[in-house]
Each structure stands twice: as structure tokens, then as C-alpha cells.
């Protein structure tokens, strides 16, 4: 049966339930247990044994096996699954005053996907399956759409992200990923709060987009008649709080950057930024180690983990090494020895580093060499320290190395996971750096920062020596859940509209069959599609949007591949 036929059949069942006086969309249910509790509590119950303890449980029917006077359902709740043992005589006796034909109605009017509440006792069947031996049932929600085929599951990756609710139903490991994400963020907050850090929320809508080199999303406030930006970082407002007298502050929240999408990047993502007065980047390294190792131990119970087949040892202390030394280690280039940019470019080209001609300074060339030749090799936790000043406009100059700043980035499995500075507190130096950024912005650099005059005013009132830290929550969750893509750890990642991925389509006039191939490789046939609909699709400026509005859900279809 097609999905539309299944939906139509289930709608008929909805009407039948209503005619029987049953509301197929109940108001509430009182459970006494969850599936996992029962599985644990009665793990030692012998086959064939029954416990005279009445329980009430609710969940989604994941599978049905129906016989003459017996039926076996698999019920899934948030914690796991348990079998329902459904005996006609027992149910009819218990529900005689409610529904004289309760067992047959259960067989005929329920489907996999429905949400069911049951009351009964605990029994382990002769085959060894722990079960709720049902006395009474209540249909709590009648589903209209079928779950994915139980053998093949939901395997279309794009559909998994697009219909995360279905992904969560059929893939328990996905639910576990988001449980762990919640445990990780709670653990980070707990770690910081135990050390007297205070979480303070800062604006998402900002008049200046600052705190990072990134392209912002732009919006407009109608009443104030002003352009606003979704924040690209929480840094500048948290620093204002340090100026105001708070000594330990943080914010764990959403950041928005109008940039590309990849397995490591989503335009909307989560970070935590932490600022501590009277501290420097050495203190932030210790704090970073403490946060990540504590959370890993709490959530996973170990510091020896595996990421995509690669063993990772999170045991501190982690390696600390300068960017200069790493570039020399992996390329043989000693950037401390170069006297001119041209000399550095020539040596870099000889070392096979791409994009050398675009570099405008030795510092930027050093960073390019690091990104191209070093980053991917930093598998074990590594603090890369002492960055060029050109790429770090908000960091304090290095106290002993001219041209560098006191900054580190934490790399694990070849990707940046954290970033930290000894924060720049000199308002004159900060103004000069931001004005240089503003010149780049005026010249067309969409990622350069502007001059935030209010932030500079705050610095002129005096900011104490401060250490700052940012950790990418999504990447940390990826690491601790062994997830290959950032989309696997964001519940609802940003995706192109489904209709916009039409690759090609064809139309058979005689049978009025429209065949559409999507970029994902899926091919669908839509039946009894009038020629006028096909002509409108031909002429539509956005075929994907036209498909979503005028074809999807309007015609019977069959998936060919």
C-alpha cells in the first residue's frame, strides 16, 4: 500500500474509534513505571513466572504480532522497550464494562506507531520474554502515517535530519546522543558553578556584530528603524560584565554565522564562552582540561575514548606546543628565521603549501601553513599556543615574543574544539586593531569586524587582566558521542528546503505519471497528475517550492529507489 492509502485506512479507523465512543487523542495517562525500570526490576524473573504487581505503562507500538486469541505488541517508551502479552479472555473480562469487544477492537483498530497505555501484571513468557500481561488498554494517540520499514529503518540521511522526530522514534542510539548532549551541557554548567562562575545571558540581537571574524545574519527592527545582527559571539558583552565588576562569568548559548554548511559547520551552533578576571591563557588551559575531562568522566565513565575508530586519550596534562614549533615539525619551515614576506612565500611554495600568494603577512602565512599541513594531524588533545597578532585582534600581545599574542586553540581529532586568549585590555591598542579590521570590512571583507564604540568605551573605564575561553559545544558533543557530522548532534540542523533538491523529472502523458529524481538519489512516481500541473512545474521559477506547494501530498505515489 502507498503511504496515502495507509493514511486513508487509518483515518477510517479514527472514525470507527469515535463511533465506539473512544477518543483517539486522549488527554493524559498515569504511568507507574517505564520500560527500563521493569526490565531492571524483574531481570531475575524466571520463564513462566508471574508477579501479582499491577503496573501502568505507556508508549508507542513498534511491532505487532496478532493471532486468534493472543497478540504480542512491542511497546517503546523513552527508556526502552517491553513486550505486551495480550490475551483475549483476560482483556474481555477486565474491560467488559468498557467495551464488550475490546480485544478485537485492539486487533483491528491499532497499528504500529500508535501510542498505547496499558495496565496489567508482570509475566515472563515461556520463551523468556519479560512482558506486561495486559488487563486493560487505552488508545492514547492514533497515528496516521506508517513508521519506516522495520527491516530497513530510516536510512536516508537527509530524511533523518529533516524528519528528526521519525529518526528519534526508530533509532534509539539517536535518542542516546541527545541525552548525552544534555548531560554534557549540564556537566559543564555544574563544573563552572561549583567554581563560582556566574552564567549571565547577553543579547542575541546586536547593533554591532563583533567578537569573531565571521559573516553575520542581518535583520531589521521595524519600530526602531535600525539594522541589527544576530550575534556571532558572546565575547564583547561578557567582557563588559568583567569591566562592570563581575570576576567570573560565562554564557552557554546559540551563535549565528552566515557561512557555509559542512560536517563540522552549521550556521546556528552552540558555544560556551568563559571569562575570568586576574587570569591569563595559562589558567584557561587548566580550566579547559578540567571542564572536558570532568564531563567526559561523568558522561562516559572513562577518559579513554574512541572517535571514528581512532583511540583518544583525554588524560591530562595535554600537550602544549607553539604554532611555530608545530609548523617546523610538520613542514621543516622555521618562520622565526624569515626576514621578509617574499622569503617566507618562496619557502612555503617549495614546501607545497597552497594559496601562498594570497597571504599579506608572515603571520598569516604561518597560520596558512598550520591549517594546511598541521591541523589534521593533531589527533590527541593538543594546546596550540602563541598565535600571530594579525589573526587575533582581541588577544593581548605576548609578554616575551614580539609579533605574537597569548592565545591557544585546543585541537582534538584534527579539529579546533576550544579557543582562548589572555584578553586585550589596552583600549588604545584595541581601537587600533578594530579600526584595521574596519578598513578590511570597508574594502569588502564580509567577515571582518567593525568598530564597537561602546565596547571601546567600556575598556577605557578599565578592564582587569582577564583570561577568556570559548569551547564549541557541538564539536565536543561530536567527540564524546562518536558522531561523524555536526548534524548528528544538532536536533534540527538547517537544511535546504526539500523541494529545492530536485535533480530532474519526466512526464508520461498517456498514463499521467510524473517521475521525479531528487539529488539524494531517491526516485518517485506520482500518479494521475494532470498535464497542467506538469506544465506549471516546467515554468515554475523554483521547481522545488512549486513541488512542495502543488504536488507533494496531493497525488498518490510510489518510491522507485
Swiss-Prot record:
Enzyme class at the top of the EC tree: ligase
Q: Subcellular localization, per the record?
A: Cytoplasm
**EC nos:** 6.1.1.6
Q: Name one GO molecular function term.
A: ATP binding
Per UniProt, Mg(2+) 2 binds at 416
Enumerate the UniProt keywords alphabetically. Aminoacyl-tRNA synthetase, ATP-binding, Cytoplasm, Ligase, Magnesium, Metal-binding, Nucleotide-binding, Protein biosynthesis
Cellular component aspect of the GO annotation: cytosol
List, alphabetically, the SUPFAM superfamilies matched: Class II aaRS and biotin synthetases, Nucleic acid-binding proteins
Q: Kindly give the PROSITE patterns that the UniProt entry links to this protein.
A: AA_TRNA_LIGASE_II
Q: Which reaction does it catalyse?
A: tRNA(Lys) + L-lysine + ATP = L-lysyl-tRNA(Lys) + AMP + diphosphate
What's the superkingdom here?
A: Bacteria
How many cofactor units bind, and how? Binds 3 Mg(2+) ions per subunit.
* BP-aspect Gene Ontology terms: lysyl-tRNA aminoacylation
Q: Name one Pfam family in it.
A: tRNA_anti-codon
Q: Where does Mg(2+) 1 bind?
A: 409, 416
Instruction: Give disulfide pairs as residue numbers.
Output: none
Q: Which metal ions or organic cofactors does this protein require, according to UniProt?
A: Mg(2+)
Q: How does it assemble?
A: Homodimer.
- Which PANTHER family did the record assign? LYSINE--TRNA LIGASE, CHLOROPLASTIC_MITOCHONDRIAL, LYSYL-TRNA SYNTHETASE
The entry assigns this protein to a family as follows:
Belongs to the class-II aminoacyl-tRNA synthetase family.
What protein is this chain from? Lysine--tRNA ligase
Source organism: Nostoc punctiforme (strain ATCC 29133 / PCC 73102)
Lineage of the species this protein comes from: Bacteria, Bacillati, Cyanobacteriota, Cyanophyceae, Nostocales
What gene is behind this protein? Answer: lysS
Amino acid at each position: 500500500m502507498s503511504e496515502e492509502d495507509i493514511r486513508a485506512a487509518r483515518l477510517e479507523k479514527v472514525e470507527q474509534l469515535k463511533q465506539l465512543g473512544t477518543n483517539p487523542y486522549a488527554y493524559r495517562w498515569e504511568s507507574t513505571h517505564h520500560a527500563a525500570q521493569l526490565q531492571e526490576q524483574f531481570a531475575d524473573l524466571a520463564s513462566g513466572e508471574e508477579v501479582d504487581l499491577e503496573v501502568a505503562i505507556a508508549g508507542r507500538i513498534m511491532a505487532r504480532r496478532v493471532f486468534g486469541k493472543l497478540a504480542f505488541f512491542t511497546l517503546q517508551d523513552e527508556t526502552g522497550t517491553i513486550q505486551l502479552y495480550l490475551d483475549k479472555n483476560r482483556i474481555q473480562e477486565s474491560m467488559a464494562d468498557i467495551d464488550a469487544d475490546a480485544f478485537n477492537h485492539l486487533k483491528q483498530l491499532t497499528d504500529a506507531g500508535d501510542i498505547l497505555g496499558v495496565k496489567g501484571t508482570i509475566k515472563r513468557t515461556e520463551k523468556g520474554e519479560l512482558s506486561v500481561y495486559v488487563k486493560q488498554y487505552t488508545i492514547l494517540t492514533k497515528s496516521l502515517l506508517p513508521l519506516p520499514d522495520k527491516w530497513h529503518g530510516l536510512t536516508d540521511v537527509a530524511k533523518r535530519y529533516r524528519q528528526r522526530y521519525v529518526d528519534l522514534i526508530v533509532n534509539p542510539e539517536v535518542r542516546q546522543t541527545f541525552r548525552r548532549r544534555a548531560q554534557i551541557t549540564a556537566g559543564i554548567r555544574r563544573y563552572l558553578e561549583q567554581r563560582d562562575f556566574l552564567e549571565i545571558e547577553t543579547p542575541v540581537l546586536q547593533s554591532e556584530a563583533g567578537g569573531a571574524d565571521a559573516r553575520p545574519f542581518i535583520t531589521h527592527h521595524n519600530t526602531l528603524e535600525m539594522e541589527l545582527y544576530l550575534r556571532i559571539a558572546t565575547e564583547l558583552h561578557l567582557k563588559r560584565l568583567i569591566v562592570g565588576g563581575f570576576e567570573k562569568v560565562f554564557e552557554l548559548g546559540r551563535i549565528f554565522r552566515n557561512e557555509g554548511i559542512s560536517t563540522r559547520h552549521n550556521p546556528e551552533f552552540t558555544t560556551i564562552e568563559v571569562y575570568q578576571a586576574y587570569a591569563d591563557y595559562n589558567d584557561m588551559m587548566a580550566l579547559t582540561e578540567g571542564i572536558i575531562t570532568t564531563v567526559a568522566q561523568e558522561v562516559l565513565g572513562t577518559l579513554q575514548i574512541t572517535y571514528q575508530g581512532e583511540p583518544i586519550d583525554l588524560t591530562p596534562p595535554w600537550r602544549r606546543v607553539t604554532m611555530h614549533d608545530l609548523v617546523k615539525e610538520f613542514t621543516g619551515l622555521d618562520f622565526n628565521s624569515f626576514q621578509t614576506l617574499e622569503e617566507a612565500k618562496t619557502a612555503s611554495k617549495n614546501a607545497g603549501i597552497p594559496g601562498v600568494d594570497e597571504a599579506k603577512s608572515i603571520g598569516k602565512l604561518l597560520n596558512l601553513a598550520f591549517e594546511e599541513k598541521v591541523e589534521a594531524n593533531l589527533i590527541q588533545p593538543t594546546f596550540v599556543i602563541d598565535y600571530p597578532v594579525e589573526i587575533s585582534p582581541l588577544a593581548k600581545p605576548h609578554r616575551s615574543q614580539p609579533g605574537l599574542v597569548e592565545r591557544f586553540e585546543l585541537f582534538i581529532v584534527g579539529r579546533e574544539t576550544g579557543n582562548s586568549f589572555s584578553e586585550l585590555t589596552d583600549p588604545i591598542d584595541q581601537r587600533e586593531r578594530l579600526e584595521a579590521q574596519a578598513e578590511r570590512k570597508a574594502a569588502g571583507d564580509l567577515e571582518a569586524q567593525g568598530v564597537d564604540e561602546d565596547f571601546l568605551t567600556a575598556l577605557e573605564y578599565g578592564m582587569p587582566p582577564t583570561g577568556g575561553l570559548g569551547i564549541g559545544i557541538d564539536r565536543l558533543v561530536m567527540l564524546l558521542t562518536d558522531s561523524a557530522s555536526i548534524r548528528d548532534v544538532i536536533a534540527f540542523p538547517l537544511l535546504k528546503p526539500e523541494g529545492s533538491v530536485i535533480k530532474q523529472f519526466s512526464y508520461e502523458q498517456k498514463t499521467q505519471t510524473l517521475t521525479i529524481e531528487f539529488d539524494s538519489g531517491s526516485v518517485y512516481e506520482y500518479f494521475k497528475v494532470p498535464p497542467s500541473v506538469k506544465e506549471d512545474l516546467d515554468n515554475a521559477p523554483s521547481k522545488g517550492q512549486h513541488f512542495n506547494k502543488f504536488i507533494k501530498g496531493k497525488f498518490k505515489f510510489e518510491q522507485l529507489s
